[in-house]
C-alpha cells in the first residue's frame, strides 16, 4: 500500500510537470492556432536560467525561480514578436519547419553554452524526506503539487476574469471577429506566448531540483505535452491539464509495477486509446480554450 501511495504521488508530480507544459501548448494552439514544437525548449531554457541564478549567482530559491520565470516570459514575448509573427500567415508546413528549426537551434545553443553534462539543482527541500506511515517523499514533490494548484487556479482566474484573458477566450473562438471589433490580436498573441513560456519555466523551477536539466530535455517533454493536448481536446486548457495528470499517474504506476522501460511510451499509448474511444478528446469537441 505504501508503494502504491508513493507511486501515485510521484505520478502526480510528473502530471504537474506535464500539465504546466501542456497548458501553455494548449493555450498557444487555442488562441493563436499554432503548434509550437519548440515549446519544450522553453522548459529547458527556464531550467538553465534557474540553475544559473540559483547555483552560479547564489540567489535564494524563490528569487532565482521568479527571475527565471520572468526571463522566459520575456523570451516568449520576443519569440512571438520575431519568429511566430513572421510565419503565422504561412502554411502549416512552414510553421512546422520553423518551430522545429527553432527547437534544434536552441538545443544546440544550449550544448555550446552549458555543455552536454546534466546540471543538478539540489535544494534543501529536495533532499529533505517526509515520512508518514511508511510513505517516504521529498518535500520538493509536495511543493510542486501545492505550487501547481496555485498556478492553475491563477491561470483559471486570469482567463475567466481579466481583460486580457477574456480577449484570449474571444480570440480562441473567432480571431477575425475580434480584429473587426477592435481587439488588438497581436497583443493578445504576445501575451499568450509570454504566459505559455512562463508556465514552462515555472515547471522547470519547481521540478529541476528533482530531475536534472540537460540540452535535449525539451524534445521528449514536447511530445508528451502534445499527447496530453490531443487527449484532452485540442486547444482546451482544462482538458490538457486533466490528461497530463492521468498520463503522469499511469506512467508512474507502469514504471513501478511493470517496467521502467515502458515509462516513456505510456503518454502515446494513452493518447491512442483516448482517440479510439473519444476521437475529439476526453471532453469532446469544444470551441475556445
Describe each model-derived feature in a short phrase.
Residues 4-54, 79-94, 231-237:
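Single transmembrane alpha-helix segments in multi-pass membrane proteins
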Residues 20, 24, 66-78, 101, ...:
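Generic alpha-helical transmembrane segments of integral inner-membrane proteins
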Amino acid at each position: 500500500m505504501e508503494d502504491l501511495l508513493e507511486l501515485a504521488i510521484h505520478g502526480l508530480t510528473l502530471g504537474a510537470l506535464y500539465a504546466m507544459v501542456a497548458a501553455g501548448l494548449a493555450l498557444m494552439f487555442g488562441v493563436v492556432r499554432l503548434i509550437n514544437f519548440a515549446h519544450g525548449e522553453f522548459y529547458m531554457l527556464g531550467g538553465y536560467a534557474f540553475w544559473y541564478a540559483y547555483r552560479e549567482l547564489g540567489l535564494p530559491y524563490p528569487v532565482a525561480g521568479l527571475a527565471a520565470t520572468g526571463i522566459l516570459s520575456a523570451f516568449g514575448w520576443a519569440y512571438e514578436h520575431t519568429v511566430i509573427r513572421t510565419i503565422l500567415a504561412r502554411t502549416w508546413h512552414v510553421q512546422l519547419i520553423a518551430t522545429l528549426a527553432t527547437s534544434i537551434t536552441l538545443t544546440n545553443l544550449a550544448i555550446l553554452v552549458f555543455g552536454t553534462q546534466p546540471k543538478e539543482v539540489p535544494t534543501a527541500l529536495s533532499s529533505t524526506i517526509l515520512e508518514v506511515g511508511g510513505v517516504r517523499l521529498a518535500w520538493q514533490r509536495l511543493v510542486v503539487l501545492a505550487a501547481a494548484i496555485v498556478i492553475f487556479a491563477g491561470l483559471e482566474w486570469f482567463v475567466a476574469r481579466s481583460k486580457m484573458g477574456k480577449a484570449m477566450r474571444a480570440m480562441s473562438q473567432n480571431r477575425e471577429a475580434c480584429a473587426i471589433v477592435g481587439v488588438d490580436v497581436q497583443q493578445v498573441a504576445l501575451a499568450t506566448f509570454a504566459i505559455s513560456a512562463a508556465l514552462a519555466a515555472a515547471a522547470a523551477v519547481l521540478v529541476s531540483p528533482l530531475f536534472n536539466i540537460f540540452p535535449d530535455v525539451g524534445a521528449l517533454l514536447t511530445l508528451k505535452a502534445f499527447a496530453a493536448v490531443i487527449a484532452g481536446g485540442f486547444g482546451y486548457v482544462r482538458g490538457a491539464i486533466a490528461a497530463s495528470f492521468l498520463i503522469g499517474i499511469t506512467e508512474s504506476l507502469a514504471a513501478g509495477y511493470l517496467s521502467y522501460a515502458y515509462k516513456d511510451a505510456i503518454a502515446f499509448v494513452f493518447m491512442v486509446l483516448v482517440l479510439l474511444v473519444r476521437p475529439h478528446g476526453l471532453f469532446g469537441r469544444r470551441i475556445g480554450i
